Amino acid sequence: MNNHHVKQFIKQGLMRLAPEVAGVWQSARERRHIRRFEQRMGLTELKRSYLTQHELSVASGPFAGMKYLSESVCSALVPKLVGSYEAELHEIIAQALEAGYTTVVDVGCAEGYYANGFALRLPSVPVYAFDIDVQARRLCSAMANLNDLQDQVTVAGRCDPERLNVVLTGHSLVICDCEGYEENLLRPDLAPALAQADVLVELHDHIRPGISATLQSRFRDTHDITLVTAIDRDPACYPGLLFSDPADRRLAVSEFRPAHQQWAFFRAKTGNAAA
């Protein structure tokens, strides 16, 4: 057994026997990888430069005005501050903000861009934010405090289908970005409340091949399905960017996603959604 197989064997064993420990180990490893990538691509210096020229808040998009932190978890910070982050989803998010949800659940919340953003825009709606990464939970709580949302946003660790089923009440929205774990989590057979919930999930076929087809087959009978594919950003759409160098402007709105990255929005069919 070579070193790669040994590492895979240990990882699989940890995920099976001690998923929380495995999650912490995996998150720490991913953070180290991202730090090296950011330094190599010039993103570390770009972030410093951005923070000296712009306010520490979201400049545009559905969560414009939200106060932010000077760090992020396993994703680029500057696109979130610019307001270009996951711009492909802005139309869906705008619709979601008008949908009358009674609960929002964010699994894989990181520092809380979506959890706190939805809480800010839906002040009477409870938001549950889950992440296995200790640093993510700390930052999500800190951002909730920064925006005076601490009584509205509940931050917790691991979320399994049983826990998800408990927190889904009324007309709920589930936001899911958990690096392939969505295949384990989004199980209507184990969480029947998913049949009445709307679900916005980032798909990770590059981690678990076939996951898109699996999830679509689970929700096809109860939900209308919309697939959204990632596209490149045009910095000209964000006039608030103060960088003069065109290369820096492009870098500021880049998210470095895998080719053909997709999201799925599962909207509960009329008559199936909770009242």
Language-model regions, residue ranges each:
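Conserved glycine-rich SAM-binding loop
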Residues: 110-111, 181
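Membrane-proximal basic amphipathic "stem/tether" segments
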Residues: 1-64
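S-adenosyl-L-methionine
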Residues: 130-181
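Conserved SAM-dependent methyltransferase scaffold
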Residues: 115-116
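Conserved class I S-adenosyl-L-methionine
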Residues: 101-110
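Rossmann-like AdoMet/SAM-dependent catalytic core
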Residues: 8, 12-16, 206-275
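Conserved alpha-helix/loop element of class I SAM-dependent methyltransferases that forms part
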Residues: 83-100
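Class I SAM-dependent transferase core
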Residues: 52-87
